[in-house]
């Protein structure tokens, strides 16, 4: 995986509905082609195993799709759920103890986000909120990923 492929995915990701998809495609992985809400076409890994979520509340949607263990694929996140919905977080943590061990990268829309750590984890998909596309552009995260 390299920064360029992660960038390609992030640019596409910043524009899908509630969850936006970005990915770094591994050459040998089976991929699918998707079109995001902005009309961008991107290839993503068909069954990603390493996902970073830009906001903790995205775990609610992931839980709908992966009811057995919504945290199984999450390798990093913005752990704001702990602050904004502590009751739900405690329930998730009780059911899925590994939630407590997931590293937080802070906000992907600010300087606190650690791009190097995201890449070092072998991240295949980054999910971001469409409402923060402008913030992602203004923070320079898309440009940083393009370098």
Regions found by a protein language model. Give the residues of each.
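A short, structured surface patch at a secondary-structure boundary
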Residues: 59-120, 125-134
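Hydrophobic core
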Residues: 14-26
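Charged, glycine-enriched surface loops/patches
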Residues: 78, 135-147
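Bacterial Sec-exported substrate-binding components of ABC uptake systems
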Residues: 2-3, 24-63
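Extracellular/periplasmic catalytic domains that process cell-envelope and extracellular macromolecules
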Residues: 43-47, 68-69, 119-121, 146
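Bacterial N-terminal signal peptides that target proteins for export
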Residues: 2-17
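A short helix-to-beta-strand connector/capping loop
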Residues: 30, 99-101, 147
